[in-house]
Amino acid sequence: MENIITATIFGSVILLAVAALATAIGFSLLGGKFLESSARQPELAASLQTKMFIVAGLLDAISMIAVGIALLFIFANPFIGLLN
């Protein structure tokens, strides 16, 4: 039983680390492309900023979903029920 709990915690930690890394890479690419495109065409900066915030919200949702899945696996572990 301890092996299942340990493996679940390690899996949850890896899930959270990958989600945080993917979100950080996504935000850096999004910010860089926004600055590049608004420097190229300053008259479209307001429209681009709105679209950037929408995509930033979707990027942030990825890590929130990963946190929810990790909390499910840590506190309501469905694999322990398979032991009996």
Swiss-Prot record:
Signal peptide location: none
This protein's record includes keyword Cell membrane: yes
Entry GO CC: plasma membrane; proton-transporting ATP synthase complex; proton-transporting two-sector ATPase complex, proton-transporting domain
GO molecular function annotation: lipid binding; proton-transporting ATP synthase activity, rotational mechanism
Pfam family, one: ATP-synt_C
Keywords: ATP synthesis, Cell inner membrane, Cell membrane, CF(0), Hydrogen ion transport, Ion transport, Lipid-binding, Membrane, Transmembrane, Transmembrane helix, Transport
Family annotation (PROSITE patterns): ATPASE_C
Entry-linked Gene3D superfamilies: F1F0 ATP synthase subunit C (1.20.20.10)
Bilayer disposition of the protein: Multi-pass membrane protein
Annotated site residue numbers, Reversibly protonated during proton transport: D60
Transmembrane parts of this sequence: 9-29, 54-74
InterPro entries to which the protein is assigned, alphabetical: ATP_synth_csu_bac/chlpt (IPR005953), ATP_synth_F0_csu (IPR000454), ATP_synth_F0_csu_DDCD_BS (IPR020537), ATP_synth_F0_csu_sf (IPR038662), ATPase_proteolipid_c-like_dom (IPR002379), F/V-ATP_Csub_sf (IPR035921)
Subcellular location: Cell inner membrane
Role according to the record: F(1)F(0) ATP synthase produces ATP from ADP in the presence of a proton or sodium gradient. F-type ATPases consist of two structural domains, F(1) containing the extramembraneous catalytic core and F(0) containing the membrane proton channel, linked together by a central stalk and a peripheral stalk. During catalysis, ATP synthesis in the catalytic domain of F(1) is coupled via a rotary mechanism of the central stalk subunits to proton translocation. Key component of the F(0) channel; it plays a direct role in translocation across the membrane. A homomeric c-ring of between 10-14 subunits forms the central stalk rotor element with the F(1) delta and epsilon subunits.
Family: Belongs to the ATPase C chain family.
UniProt subunit comment: F-type ATPases have 2 components, F(1) - the catalytic core - and F(0) - the membrane proton channel. F(1) has five subunits: alpha(3), beta(3), gamma(1), delta(1), epsilon(1). F(0) has three main subunits: a(1), b(2) and c(10-14). The alpha and beta chains form an alternating ring which encloses part of the gamma chain. F(1) is attached to F(0) by a central stalk formed by the gamma and epsilon chains, while a peripheral stalk is formed by the delta and b chains.
Protein name: ATP synthase subunit c
